[in-house]
Amino acid sequence: MLPSHKQTIAQLLSDAVGSLLPEGQARPEIVLERPKQAAHGDIACNVALQLAKPLGTNPRELAGKIADAIRADARGQRLVAAVEIAGPGFINLRLSAAARADVIAAVFAEGDRYGAANTHDGAPVLVEFVSANPTGPLHVGHGRQAALGDALASLLDWQGHKVHREFYYNDAGVQIHNLAVSVQARARGYKPGDANWPEAAYNGDYIADIAADYLAGKTVRASDGEPVTGERDVENIEAIRRFAVTYLRNEQDIDLQAFGVKFDRYYLESSLYTEGKVQQTVDALVAAGKTYEQEGALWLRTTDDGDDKDRVMRKSDGAYTYFVPDVAYHTTKWGRGFTQVINVQGSDHHGTIARVRAGLQGLNIGIPKGYPDYVLHKMVTVMKDGAEVKISKRAGSYVTVRDLIEWSNGDAESEAGVDTIRACVEAGEPNWPARFTRGRDAVRFFLLSRKADTEFVFDVDLALKQSDENPVYYVQYAHARICSVFERAGVDAASLTSADLAAVTGPDVSPQATALVQRLAAFPDMLADAARELAPHAVAFYLRDLAGDFHAFYNADRVLVDDEAVKRARLALLAATRQVLRNGLAVIGVSAPQKM
């Protein structure tokens, strides 16, 4: 039901209850639910069951009095067609034709912003996601983070937040050193398996590509940084490191472009060291008495804040453990005014949550407990040609986001092993990401089609199917099908705002029409719930249900009939459905094609 209807009906019930309560007794909270069975109406409320015992009244009798008050109220007469008492005292309400017509009118009036709310009035929120090490291509786990994080950020924007998308580059530490020595080994002519190949080196073909470009003196640049030119000197490990990191950051930028994700800021872990923020954080924790030394190491008293044991901050060799810069990084988030922060990360980060939060609490700078929030996702398995894919030639040990986008795009060149995204970039093809819309849409939708905390199997063969089995095709086809109906009808949707909607909202309409209107009405509340619960998968679930309701209605009620009033009413319902499909797809970054 529309949020405005929900508010009115809740107030209506509250007023009805208030009229029956003894003077001075507080009114209970009114909770509205959707009945499990459509035959029981549109709204259910158990307030009579709650109040019967305190009032010493039979719950059915009390429910009957509440129902009489609703029927006598002008608000109830407009929005409620029937009030029924069920079981021991449940109050079931059926919405009126006017209430259903309001849904379609609201979609027409609000258009591309139907479902949006200004609940949070511009309150800032930072969503950190992807945050990959610049040591290799983005893998499918990063892809799941990109889909989840970008959709979540969009959801929060739709609820009135001022959203900041941030990517944290782990460009410090031993993994970056391993990257540099890997490229150096390739530049010297070694390859995996050779006696001189470093033990901790990366083996993917991309390492050879970086080495070749470094030796060729090519220039690379990340989207937010200065250009770096290969110095050709195989002995200069720092120059190799700088070139390799920038090269891979640029590669990740390309993958994110193909995926349709834009960040407001890329934050470098290395800057926390160069700007002294890590040392400042450690010094502050020491000064606060939150640390102690043991066996040459510096420990943080994380057990004070719920961790199962204290944690090492600085090892005996002087190196900081990985959660220390994380604590420093989060102090910058708080210092920049982000009182709400959400980190989207793999489930392997679960163990760091208590440590980061304990470190932030130890600083005693006003950060609330439970800061930041986390959305953790489980792993993704990739299936192709009926078998699990474990190794990518490009990456060496895992399937990349680029692999998924190219495979799901259905290009013959990609099937033949050509890096088509790289080819488009090198050819300077204008607006090249548009060429990969099909693959991007499939990857985004699929990676949102399960809850984040469940493991997911990405079936490339299914992503390429043009059938109802393919969830993104099923939803997009609903949108395209409606566009086709309007093309055949030769009717401008804007002309339907004044249509008589009785044929789709009246008492004698098909159950399919009623179900479709109910689904449209649920869109704003679904978005609000998904944002509050940090659950972007709910949008994908809703879109599949909406597409199903549309297809059921379309198959049950012929739209282009001779009766002009009926035709216009059904076209108006289709126009509203198309708008909500488009809005929902926009929230999760998936296109709404007019033809398929």
Swiss-Prot record:
EC category: ligase
CDD domains in the cross-refs: Anticodon_Ia_Arg, ArgRS_core
Location of the motif 'HIGH' region: 132-142
Keyword vocabulary terms for this entry: Aminoacyl-tRNA synthetase, ATP-binding, Cytoplasm, Ligase, Nucleotide-binding, Protein biosynthesis
Domain of life from the UniProt record: Bacteria
EC number: 6.1.1.19
Protein's GO biological process: arginyl-tRNA aminoacylation
Localization per Swiss-Prot or TrEMBL: Cytoplasm
PROSITE patterns the UniProt entry points to: AA_TRNA_LIGASE_I
Protein family per UniProt: Belongs to the class-I aminoacyl-tRNA synthetase family.
NCBIfam families in the record: argS
Protein name (record): Arginine--tRNA ligase
Gene for this chain: argS
